Swiss-Prot record:
This is Vascular endothelial growth factor receptor 2. Its EC number is 2.7.10.1. InterPro entries: Ig-like_dom (IPR007110), Ig-like_dom_sf (IPR036179), Ig-like_fold (IPR013783), Ig_I-set (IPR013098), Ig_sub (IPR003599), Ig_sub2 (IPR003598), Kinase-like_dom_sf (IPR011009), Prot_kinase_dom (IPR000719). The modification Phosphothreonine is found at T1236. It comes from the Eukaryota. Disruption phenotype: Embryonic lethality at 8.5 to 9.5 dpc, due to early defects in the development of hematopoietic and endothelial cells, leading to defects in vasculogenesis and endocardium development. At 7.5 dpc, there are no blood islands in the yolk sac. Organized blood vessels are absent in the yolk sac and in the embryo. The chain crosses the membrane at residues 763-783. Changing K866R: Loss of enzyme activity. Abolishes ubiquitination in response to VEGFA binding. Glycans are attached at residues 46, 98, 145, 160, 247, 320, 376, 397, 509, 521, 578, 611, 617, 629, 673, 702, 719. The lineage of its organism: Eukaryota, Metazoa, Chordata, Craniata, Vertebrata. Gene3D superfamilies: Immunoglobulins, Phosphorylase Kinase, domain 1, Transferase(Phosphotransferase) domain 1. GO terms for biological process: blood vessel endothelial cell differentiation; branching involved in blood vessel morphogenesis; branching morphogenesis of an epithelial tube; calcium ion homeostasis; cell fate commitment; cell migration; cellular response to hydrogen sulfide; cellular response to vascular endothelial growth factor stimulus. It comes from Mus musculus (Mouse). The keyword Hydrolase does not apply. Residues 46-111, 143-209, 226-325, 330-416, 423-542, 549-656, 665-751 form the Ig-like C2-type domain.
Length: 1345
């Protein structure tokens, strides 16, 4: 038996060990065993607590206020012995009251545990402060059915605890029912009992000692939800693949917990993301905000439907919903019901709505007659066009263009607005409503009517004067109930004829209706009535026939009180009798006949009869009413009545008598002292008033001043004028105004400065000499202008923007008809502060200035002001005004020098205000940056290589570049710079720009911007004609601007015009068809753009270096010889130059293609430099192609290693990927290689020195002996003009510059106003002119200087 027992014990031990090692299921495990068998253990403070736990698996201890083994006071150790291999002992030495709580021993991976609650009896700290008290905050609700637990647990189980609340203070004692205290839980009571309190605490008494728990702040938790708002609030439209974001915002009362739930359409893909968070409320709001965001990164058609956001606080639920519509792709279309014609009456409000179906919402732009419309105080632009008070000027064609911002699809619709104007009669505003006509005379009555649309009809009516009511004081004093047609003139005046004349004047329909009265016999009223669909207009004419009495006032028309006044009524004594005076008093206005007032003559009995004195002469009877010492009560309306001897009919005349109140003299304002010089004129006015009119007397130094030679008194002595003042005219002058009521005085001091006046003889001699000199000077000017002037039909178009078609209007008339909106462009001269001159020309100048308030973004802006010099002629003034109008016509673009304003009002010089580019022209800038050029700048190693590369430039190369550019000209604008632009900019804030290195990226960026600007000018149908680096200005942030496009010509118009004399043209930049056939097109500008690229990538070198501009040069250029690659270019850029230099203009790329190509090249360079993108100083966004077909050299070192690629003489092959823009080009073939001017050795030309002020870069050097040869060869060569749609007759010798635009110097010498040439240049001009003459058979005149 003993052995069996031992075997059983061993077997149990193995099973237990196996179960522990492999782990038994939870159903087979027994809870761990604790060393104490009690559920509650009570120990004293400062003793040691030790509990051992044994079990069948790995064990862990948990104790109050701690997480596992995180507290250093608590010691958990492995224990041995006993009947279990898994054993842990928890030991806490010197326990305190806060150690009271549940101690739990559990298996590590199974939720099976044993717990003992330990009281550490500490009478000094009977309440436990544990971490589970949530920092002393108790959350409650005001629900009566809810209870709240204040967690003031005790270290002693049988405490007598009460709850204290404040404020106000209140105590709660356990009642064994709803209010209780449990040492393991805390104090429990209904929450509403302490909802008023701010804080609570538990209190207990032990041995007459009172102990308190920690303070608990009472926080009342709310439930109210004010609103739930969805954003966007309206129906949402998206296209497939777009991102959907719905924000659901809930506003609640404070201390509310909120749960969000979203209800959305079922979707196949699980791609919805919901994020909930609290939102910080706005300051001052008593509300809490919660936000739930639903996001779908890429919506599909299945995501379409209703989305509902539900917010719940437990007791309250609110929701909001929206509908999401998903389109398969963006679209745009006009809806049905769009009108094409809208009619409105002048003065009314007009609305032109736009109905469309689109996703996304389109960009809406309105245009009126092709010009964009912006919102202002009269027009509101948006989804509908609203014109507040339509006028005749608002009529026209309105076009709305809708643009889909994603697909960029455009839809347009035009609406014609017709403004109808009711008939307006012009004479109503000009003629008094009561007119008098002599008896028996023929009279003509006229109505001039303006109306739109034309009148339906215009009719004349009449009525006898006595048949109409009389309303004194009214604008139309007569009112007639019935009107008779003029054809029924029985009882009235006989009508001889009526006729209507129609005309269309300035877009207005004008109708003149005439009524001819054969004899004025009867006083009547005539009415002309005009009617059209917009309304009606009428004019009533009082045709008052005079053959009766006349009234006059003596002695004055407006007498003053206390003067003797007489009213005289004069009548023909053979016709009239019984003359009587009446006064029209207040009682007359109360007499009625029916409903209308009666005429005066029908109501004489109601008037106040006056006594008068009768006088007679051979023809007239005169009845006089005299007022001695007239008073204000005497004024009023007086009626003179006379009876016809034959008909006994009474005729009445009304006269209003006005008596002015007496007023003592008064001088308003003070006379100011005046200081002048001898020989000038002094004028002073004495502003005196009074009744009777005061008599004015002037005194000088208290002596009466009388009129004398040079002293003039006018306007009743009010105005004093002293001409040709002398020294003795100085002194104290007194103005005295007197009438019967007194006098008033005012004084002024005249101070005369300067030397004593010369004698009259000396004055006569000086005046005579001046007159003779003026005569000879005018004669000389007339002679010179006759010699120099072109004939009358010519205008100096060299500085105009557009040359018009000669088959239409003359150029000057066409330019003058261009609009100039003074309200938009006029700028006050007093807000313009002129500074230093920037350039000057033969008749004009450019001045730097500060404009105050010309730009809304800045108080003061630096601008450039173009203005004429003193003595400019009328034609020059008209030319500058024409350029101003054309600059407005061209419009605004970032890469052109834009118009800012103008000063055109009389009283000062004509000024054209344009943008100021502080860094000067691009050619000068590039030459100044040669020593600072590095191809790449982004990486440190490459940057250092770039500096080394620049440093290793050969001295010979730099000397050659300096030699090439030493004779560079300034520009073709007609203005010679006062000093070099580099000197000017050193004085300005250019240090920031010049201190940076110049990179290949900069050069490509400059090229790209010029192409953008030329693309804009081409879109405006303008040709530049002088595109070169000297005409490109550099502004802030590396923005380049094209100037001198004032030289541009309108492509719609014929650019042919003939100039006299010799002038310089920039031959090095001109296309062959321009040189030989004078054909100027956009494609010839593309050739010039290629030369400009060469200038940029040679850092400002002069084109065709070392090449003599002679007959051989012209021949080789025509045969296809081109310039070598510049020293700093890439293969791609040189290929672009060759594309621009194609001999067939139609095969050259357009500027739009160049923009795309250079944009790709710029992006590729930026990526090669380590950038993902490049920020361009442009207003438009550049879209880059991934594969631009570009292969740039990786660094200057690689460029030097691959000498065959970087060699300027290298001939580039026609590879397919070399230029992306050629994929859609008209080009069918391209030369495999290009001959350059360096392929054939050239003899060094003889350098001819030309004065600096007339030096140019045009390269026009040709020996006179070569003229004949080139002329003969040109006759045999095909003409370039056959390739072009139009052909210019302009001489190559015509001016190639705009003389009023830009800051650069032109081809004229400012001192002599003539052009200075070398003999070679003059020869070339004559040679080319002769060649074209032989080719075209056209006789050319020499252009003016």
């Amino acid at each position: 038996m003993e052995s069996k027992a031992l075997l059983a014990v061993a077997l149990w031990f193995c099973v237990e060990t196996r179960a522990a090692s492999v782990g038994l299921p939870g159903d087979f495990l027994h809870p761990p065993k604790l060393s104490t068998q009690k559920d509650i253990l009570t120990i004293l403070a400062n003793t040691t607590l030790q509990i051992t736990c044994r079990g069948q698996r790995d064990l862990d201890w948990l104790w109050p206020n701690a997480q596992r083994d995180s507290e250093e006071r608590v010691l958990v150790t492995e224990c041995g012995g006993g009947d279990s291999i898994f054993c842990k002992t928890l030991t806490i030495p010197r326990v305190v009251g806060n150690d009271t709580g549940a101690y739990k021993c559990s298996y590590r991976d199974v939720d099976i545990a044993s717990t003992v609650y330990v009281y550490v009896r500490d009478y000094r700290s009977p309440f436990i402060a544990s971490v589970s008290d949530q920092h002393g905050i108790v959350y409650i609700t005001e629900n009566k059915n809810k209870t709240v637990v204040i967690p003031c647990r005790g270290s002693i189980s049988n405490l007598n605890v009460s709850l204290c609340a404040r404020y106000p203070e209140k105590r709660f004692v356990p009642d064994g029912n709803r209010i209780s205290w449990d040492s393991e839980i805390g104090f429990t009571l209904p929450s509403y009992m302490i909802s008023y309190a701010g804080m609570v605490f538990c209190e207990a008494k032990i041995n007459d000692e009172t102990y308190q728990s920690i303070m608990y702040i009472v926080v009342v938790v709310g439930y109210r939800i004010y609103d739930v708002i969805l954003s966007p609030p309206h129906e949402i439209e998206l296209s497939a693949g777009e991102k959907l974001v719905l924000n659901c915002t809930a506003r609640t009362e404070l201390n509310v917990g909120l749960d969000f739930t979203w209800h959305s359409p079922p979707s196949k893909s699980h791609h919805k993301k919901i994020v909930n968070r609290d939102v910080k409320p706005f300051p001052g709001t008593v509300a809490k905000m919660f936000l739930s965001t639903l996001t779908i990164e890429s919506v599909t058609k299945s995501d379409q439907g209703e989305y509902t956001c539900v917010a719940s606080s437990g007791r309250m639920i609110k929701r909001n919903r929206t509908f999401v519509r998903v389109h398969t792709k963006p679209f745009i279309a006009f809806g049905s019901g769009m009108k094409s014609l809208v009619e409105a009456t002048v003065g009314s409000q007009v609305r032109i709505p736009v109905k469309y179906l689109s996703y996304p919402a389109p960009d809406i732009k309105w245009y009126r007659n092709g010009r964009p419309i912006e919102s202002n105080y009269t027009m509101i632009v948006g989804d509908e066009l609203t014109i507040m008070e339509v006028t005749e000027r608002d009529a026209g064609n309105y076009t709305v263009i809708l643009t889909n911002p994603i697909s960029m699809e455009k839809q347009s619709h035009m609406v014609s607005l017709v403004v109808n104007v009711p008939p307006q009669i012009g004479e109503k505003a000009l003629i008094s409503p009561m007119d008098s006509y002599q008896y028996g005379t023929m009279q003509t009555l006229t109505c001039t009517v303006y109306a739109n649309p034309p009148l339906h009809h215009i009719q004349w009516y009449w009525q006898l004067e006595e048949a109409c009511s009389y309303r004194p004081g009214q604008t139309s004093p007569y009112a007639c109930k019935e009107w008779r047609h003029v054809e029924d003139f029985q009882g009235g005046n006989k009508i001889e004829v009526t006729k209507n004349q129609y005309a269309l004047i300035e877009g207005k329909n004008k109708t003149v209706s005439t009524l001819v009265i054969q004899a004025a016999n009867v006083s009547a009223l005539y009415k002309c009535e005009a009617i059209n669909k917009a309304g009606r207009g009428e004019r009533v004419i009082s045709f008052h026939v005079i053959r009766g009495p006349e009234i006059t006032v003596q002695p004055a028309a407006q007498p003053t009180e206390q003067e003797s006044v007489s009213l005289l009524c004069t009548a023909d004594r053979n016709t009239f009798e019984n003359l009587t005076w009446y006064k029209l008093g207040s009682q007359a206005t109360s007499v009625h006949m029916g409903e209308s007032l009666t005429p005066v003559c029908k109501n004489l009995d109601a008037l106040w009869k006056l006594n008068g004195t009768m006088f007679s002469n051979s023809t007239n009877d005169i009845l006089i009413v005299a007022f001695q010492n007239a008073s204000l009560q005497d004024q009023g309306d007086y009626v003179c009545s006379a009876q016809d001897k034959k008909t006994k009919k009474r005729h009445c005349l009304v006269k209003q008598l006005i008596i002015l109140e007496r007023m003592a003299p008064m001088i308003t304002g003070n006379l100011e002292n005046q200081t002048t010089t001898i020989g000038e004129t002094i004028e002073v006015t004495c502003p005196a008033s009074g009744n009777p009119t005061p008599h004015i007397t002037w005194f000088k130094d208290n002596e009466t001043l009388v009129e004398d030679s040079g002293i003039v008194l006018r306007d009743g002595n009010r105005n004093l004028t002293i001409r040709r003042v002398r020294k003795e005219d100085g002194g104290l002058y007194t103005c005295q105004a007197c009438n019967v009521l007194g006098c008033a005085r005012a004084e002024t001091l005249f101070i005369i400065e300067g030397a004593q006046e010369k004698t009259n003889l000396e004055v006569i001699i000086l005046v005579g000499t001046a007159v003779i000199a003026m005569f000879f000077w005018l004669l000389l000017v007339i002679v010179l202008r006759t010699v120099k002037r072109a004939n009358e039909g010519e205008l100096k178009t060299g500085y105009l923007s557009i040359v018009m078609d000669p088959d239409e209007l003359p150029l000057d008339e066409r330019c003058e008809r261009l609009p100039y909106d003074a309200s938009k462009w006029e700028f006050p001269r007093d807000r313009l502060k002129l500074g230093k001159p920037l350039g000057r020309g033969a008749f004009g100048q450019v001045i730097e200035a500060d404009a105050f308030g010309i730009d809304k973004t800045a108080t003061c802006k630096t601008v450039a002001v173009k203005m004429l010099k003193e003595g400019a002629t009328h034609s020059e003034h008209r030319a500058l005004m024409s350029e101003l109008k054309i600059l407005i016509h061209i419009g605004h673009h970032l890469n052109v020098v834009n118009l800012l304003g103008a000063c055109t009002k009389p009283g000062g010089p004509l000024m054209v205000i344009v943008e100021f580019c502080k860094f000067g022209n691009l050619s000068t800038y590039l030459r100044g940056k040669r020593n600072e050029f590095v191809p790449y700048k982004s990486k440190g190693a490459r940057f250092r290589q770039g500096k080394d590369y620049v440093g290793e430039l050969s001295v010979d190369l730099k000397r050659r570049l300096d030699s090439i550019t030493s004779s560079q000209s300034s520009a073709s604008s007609g203005f010679v710079e006062e000093k070099s632009l580099s000197d000017v900019e050193e004085e300005e804030a250019s240090e920031e720009l010049y201190k940076d290195f110049l990179t290949l990226e900069h050069l490509i960026c400059y090229s790209f911007q010029v192409a953008k600007g030329m693309e804009f000018l081409a879109s405006r149908k303008c040709i530049h004609r002088d595109l070169a680096a000297r005409n490109i200005l550099l502004s802030e942030k590396n923005v380049v601007k094209i100037c001198d496009f004032g030289l541009a010509r309108d492509i719609y118009k014929d650019p042919d015009y003939v100039r006299k004399g010799d002038a310089r043209l920039p031959l090095k930049w001109m296309a062959p068809e321009t040189i030989f056939d004078r054909v100027y097109t956009i494609q010839s500008d593309v050739w010039s753009f290629g030369v400009l690229l060469w200038e940029i990538f040679s850092l400002g070198a002069s084109p065709y270096p070392g090449v003599k501009i002679d007959e051989e040069f012209c021949r080789r250029l025509k045969e296809g010889t081109r310039m070598r690659a510049p020293d700093y270019t890439t293969p791609e850029m040189y290929q672009t130059m060759l594309d621009c230099w194609h001999e067939d203009p139609n095969q050259r790329p357009s500027f739009s293609e160049l923009v795309e190509h250079l944009g790709n090249l710029l992006q590729a360079n930026a990526q090669q430099d380590g950038k993902d993108y490049i920020v361009l100083p442009m207003s438009e966004t550049l879209s880059m192609e991934e594969d631009s077909g570009l292969s740039l050299p990786t660094s200057p070192v690689s460029c030097m290693e691959e000498e065959e690629v970087c060699d300027p003489k290298f001939h580039y092959d026609n590879t397919a990927g070399i230029s992306h823009y050629l994929q859609n080009s008209k080009r069918k073939s391209r030369p495999v290689s290009v001959k350059t001017f360096e392929d054939i050795p050239l003899e060094e030309p003889e350098v001819k020195v030309i004065p600096d002020d007339s030096q140019t870069d045009s390269g026009m050097v040709l020996a006179s002996e070569e003229l004949k040869t080139l002329e003969d060869r040109n006759k045999l060569s095909p003409s370039f003009g056959g390739m072009m749609p139009s052909k210019s007759r302009e001489s190559v010798a015509s001016e190639g510059s705009n003389q009023t635009s830009g800051y650069q110097s032109g081809y004229h010498s400012d001192d002599t106003d003539t052009t200075v040439y070398s003999s070679d240049e003059a020869g070339l001009l004559k040679m080319v002119d002769a060649a074209v003459h032989a080719d075209s058979g056209t006789t050319l005149r020499s252009p003016p200087v």
